[in-house]
Design a protein with these regions (language model features):
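Domain-edge interaction signal
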Residues: 1-168
Length: 168
């Protein structure tokens, strides 16, 4: 079952009172990625975009900027709660800046960033997240990507854009 990013955000905020916006969006990204890898379906239906500051759930960002909140942690099932618990145990102690830096080194954000225009967002495809979090992308060093037939650390931004445009 797929929930709303608002529901997942409500649970993250319940578990981490005072959770800031940047940190929230990175934890949503990690929750989505780990749920895709473990369960095989999205945790929430909204798309995630690559922004300058890392992954952001576009629709949630816009709604909250307009003062529209909502979401109910009570709607989530055991699998969703387990994913969130795992993500918090793994990433919950990191700051928003730490999470931003971490996401910028990971293939899903890098692939989307390679095709986005400065100051704009580009979608982070769920398949990229699934593959990365499931470990299908081998040896991801902090400085680059390594994947069979894919980009590597020496690729220029133009080469990354061309690779992503081929639908890889």
């Amino acid at each position: 079952m797929t929930w709303s990013a608002h529901d997942v955000a409500a649970e993250l905020r319940r578990r981490l009172p005072g959770l800031g916006t940047k940190r929230l969006h990175k934890l949503l990204y990690y929750s989505q990625g780990h749920h895709l890898a473990a369960v095989g379906e999205p945790l929430f239906g909204e798309s995630i975009g690559a922004w300058d500051m890392g992954p952001v759930v576009d629709a949630l960002w816009v709604a909250e900027k307009r003062g529209v909140g909502g979401g109910s942690a009570a709607a989530l099932d055991e699998a969703a709660l387990n994913t969130i618990g795992y993500v918090l145990s793994r990433y919950g102690a990191l700051s928003g800046d730490d999470l931003e830096a971490k996401t910028h080194r990971e293939p899903p954000w890098r692939l989307a960033d390679a095709v986005r225009r400065p100051g704009q967002s580009a979608p982070i495809h769920p398949q990229w997240m699934h593959d990365y979090f499931a470990g299908d992308i081998a040896d991801v060093p902090p400085t680059g990507l390594v994947a069979v037939g894919g980009p590597d650390a020496e690729d220029t931004p133009d080469e990354l854009r061309a690779w992503a445009a081929r639908g890889a």
